[in-house]
């Protein structure tokens, strides 16, 4: 088989997407991209401005390829988007792409982008980095060394920093974009948003806020599920079965989140379900005594600080 050979047929031309780094988030992005394409059994209308021609997964080894294919069986079988693979050749994977997702480990960014031939392969292309704590400036430095300029005759790539989460697999990611103003920002902007809408909702912030956004939207998933697990275990200790407790706790959290998404302030939701001296107030008293608010705020702050340190370290290494 040529680098990759698991393909579905599609007659619709469009853009080729390459994903560099097929760990948890990279795999989730591939799943979301494939699921955004029409199902093989349906003649669904095109929902997006830029149809996908092919998704290319860049993997390190044949073992990783086999593992990835197993995790993508449902998407490969159910959707019309062709899926291809490139093994141990990031430059070739980028050369074939119109859009590149950078989803490797942050410490591997320089290795992924600094290979021989990468400047030529990446020239003029949209690069969407989902690396937490690695700024656009650091990635440009990795591609163009100390000059941060493309070689003569080469168009610069356009790097966009975006924070997504693994809900991208279900097209439910909250993706936040910090797009730096460059000469081709507007040219690439509509393509970038169209691609990211395939993974969920898209919002924009200034680049300096990205560490805090990453702590909230990416790491925040783990913080929410840690609290969710604590609620589940509390209910189990009171006699509920774990399956029932898990479902009820998750639905309760989703209901509270939907109320806030609909416009209610979190404090208003709390007040609405709390009667002074009642049973909910008794539980909230315990949470206040444990200083849950302060601990949670400290977790966000600690994560944000760590992300800034990661970027500083990456910048020194590139």
Swiss-Prot record:
One of the GO biological process terms: L-proline biosynthetic process
Keyword terms: Amino-acid biosynthesis, NADP, Oxidoreductase, Proline biosynthesis
InterPro entries reported in the protein's UniProt record: 6-PGluconate_DH-like_C_sf, NAD(P)-bd_dom_sf, P5C_Rdtase_cat_N, P5CR_dimer, Pyrroline-COOH_reductase
One Gene Ontology molecular-function label: pyrroline-5-carboxylate reductase activity
Top-level EC class as recorded in UniProt: oxidoreductase
EC number: 1.5.1.-
One family name in Pfam for this protein: F420_oxidored
Pathway: Mycotoxin biosynthesis
Purpose of the protein: Pyrroline-5-carboxylate reductase; part of the gene cluster that mediates the biosynthesis of UCS1025A, a member of the pyrrolizidinone family that acts as a strong telomerase inhibitor and displays potent antibacterial and antitumor properties. These compounds share a hemiaminal-containing pyrrolizidinone core fused with a gamma-lactone, giving a furopyrrolizidine that is connected to a decalin fragment.
Family, as annotated: Belongs to the pyrroline-5-carboxylate reductase family.
Name the UniProt record assigns to this protein: Pyrroline-5-carboxylate reductase ucsG
């Amino acid at each position: 088989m040529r680098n990759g050979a698991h393909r579905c047929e599609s007659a619709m031309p469009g853009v080729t997407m390459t994903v560099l780094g097929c760990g948890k988030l990279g795999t989730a992005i591939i799943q979301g991209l494939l699921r955004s394409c029409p199902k093989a059994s349906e003649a669904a209308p095109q929902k997006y401005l830029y149809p996908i021609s092919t998704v290319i997964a860049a993997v390190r080894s044949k073992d990783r390829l086999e593992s990835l294919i197993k995790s993508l069986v449902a998407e490969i079988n159910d959707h019309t988007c062709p899926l291809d693979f490139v093994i141990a050749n990031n430059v070739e994977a980028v050369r074939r792409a119109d859009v590149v997702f950078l989803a490797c480990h942050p410490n591997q960014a320089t290795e992924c982008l600094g290979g021989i031939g990468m400047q030529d392969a990446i020239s003029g292309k949209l690069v969407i980095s989902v690396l937490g704590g690695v700024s656009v400036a650091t990635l440009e430095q990795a591609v163009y060394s100390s000059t941060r300029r493309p070689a003569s005759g080469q168009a610069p790539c356009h790097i966009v920093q975006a924070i997504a989460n693994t809900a991208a697999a279900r097209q439910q990611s909250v993706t936040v974009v910090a797009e730096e103003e460059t000469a081709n920002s507007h040219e690439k902007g509509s393509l970038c948003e169209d691609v990211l809408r395939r993974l969920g909702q898209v919002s924009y912030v200034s680049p300096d806020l990205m560490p805090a956004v990453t702590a909230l939207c990416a790491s925040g998933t783990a913080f929410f599920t840690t609290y969710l697990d604590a609620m589940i275990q509390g209910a189990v200790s009171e006699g509920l079965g774990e399956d029932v407790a898990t479902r009820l706790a998750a639905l309760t959290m989703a209901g509270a989140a939907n109320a806030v998404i609909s416009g209610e302030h979190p404090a208003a939701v709390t007040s609405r379900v709390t009667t002074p001296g009642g049973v909910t107030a008794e539980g909230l008293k315990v949470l206040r005594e444990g200083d849950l608010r302060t601990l949670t705020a400290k977790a966000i702050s600690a994560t944000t600080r760590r992300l800034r340190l990661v970027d500083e370290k990456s910048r020194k290494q590139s």
